Amino acid sequence: MIFGFMLLGIWLVASLRGGITSLDNSENMANFFQNLWITINPFERLTRGFEYFYFGFAALVVIVFGILFGYKKSRTGFVTGFIILLMTTKSAYAVLKHLPGSQYLWMLRFISIALCMILMSFLMWDRLKKPLVLMLCVLLAVDTIPSLSLIVGEHNDISVQERMAARQDSTLISNAQTVTKQRLALMDESILGATGSWLVSDYGNPVDATFGAGREAANTSTNIVNLNKAFAQGGFLYVFDRCLELGDDSVLIKKTFLKQYNNSLEDLEAAANVLGYKRVEQNSDYILYHIETPDSWGVVSSYRAVAIGSGAAAISMQFPAVETVDSANLNDYTYEELAGYKEVFLNGFTYDDKETAEDLVLRLSRAGVKVIIYADGIPQDKRTHSQNFLGVTCSSITFHNGYPDMDTRIGTIYPDMFPQGHTTWNTVYLDGLDTVWGTFYDNGLNLDFYGTVKNDNIIMTGLNLTYFYSLTDDVSVGQLLSNMSGISSEELPDRKIVPLKVEYGNNEITITSNNDNVNTTLAYHDIFSSSSDITHRNNLMYVNKGTTVVKMSYPYLWRGALVSTAGVVLMVVWLIVKRRNNN
């Protein structure tokens, strides 16, 4: 079996190094698990439609029969199918997301494999009595009824063209296609499924889109997830600003979700206007915004602050003026790269060399750059297995239902209770701060959670306040977080829309720009190469002034070919040895 995998090396190496398996995004992964009752209940299929995966009640019956009454040869497939079914549940997600390689385990995508294993074992079950075979076959056939309309249609005497045109008009997609010059963001939480993506990009007057069917596999999937999350939290300034970063001159929003998330249309409208988007059209369900741009354009941006680490996106959503970067490793950045920012946030960062990382933070702080460190995300020391950085040690603590009152330099804070599902809160407080700006009492002890170390430009905070704020939008905690950095949640990065000329050729993209450091709004991929200087930030490709020719080639070709060649050689050797042993 190992040799078989090696034979696939030319494909496998590229797949494991890039693409969907390189993504580390729990929000994307969570979309591929669901309630077991939905998975096996045919009535849920009839009432909810086709937005959920359906395993089949009949398939479950076949599994039970096979496990209980099948013999060894056929039972294996039934057991395998049952295990895969259990692994698709929300409960399994809570475990699988913590495992190494969890980015491979989007379990609902394995349902088809499970069904094939079950059917194969059913066919191999040659000892099963014919009446039972007939009964199970009839049950399997009947179980297709909830999904029958996918094959035969609705039988409502309306042609596909009429139905699609009506759907385009009712959702304002046709209006959006008319005004869109470069790209459209359809923000409806994919309620239309793949149909919505098809109506935008392949029907009528098709235009490019930011969202799409199978967007989980996109290189910009984290950007898309953050847009949806910010919209749910009411962070409309972030939404429109990042739509601009992604090259969306049109944004089409389903208004139902404003009410669902207790957000207001007035706040949405105000944020759109701040970024230059104007309302073009609206109906009872959708509202369309558009900003005037050249036909093909990019963005030159300037951020006052940068966030590094797995928690960078949460900071950026609270403070849109904060840039997120691709690597969480602090050792990947130089002093010169970070010294141009006023603030550097570290949240869930890593390092290869602790001493070098600490030295970088100290140099930045002495140069006047404020470094805000969220202590919950400080890496564990490899020798002591403790969370320690710059002489400050993180000590674990658990709260239940809510934080205690917090005494801070902006006054006493009385935070909201923990939200449902997070009533047990594991976090850290701090030992070793030079100046203490925040304390709380627990079990009669006065404990520190907020202050400075080494100098006033290095600020540390514990208690996982950023994550708490992302869940609750607690006003007092938001004020404290803003006070730490001096950045307002209303502040935006400086952006300038600039014209670009983009031409697509045979396995190449030619980009002509009149400016340096231009975000092309095109997703960056590891198949890109160029003799010119191209870079990538926040999953997007940047070019400089002049003409840049980007070549597209098969990634990791030689490494993959080497693995495949080794697989062929080892397979031949194994076959020769096996043949000699048989003789």
Q: How would you describe each model-predicted region?
A:
Residues 161-185:
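Membrane-embedded, lumen/periplasm-facing catalytic core of multi-pass transferases
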Residues 402-454, 469, 523:
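Catalytic beta-strand/loop cores that center a nucleophilic Ser/Cys/Thr
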Residues 244, 259-260, 268-271, 285-288, ...:
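Catalytic cores of secreted or luminal carbohydrate-active enzymes
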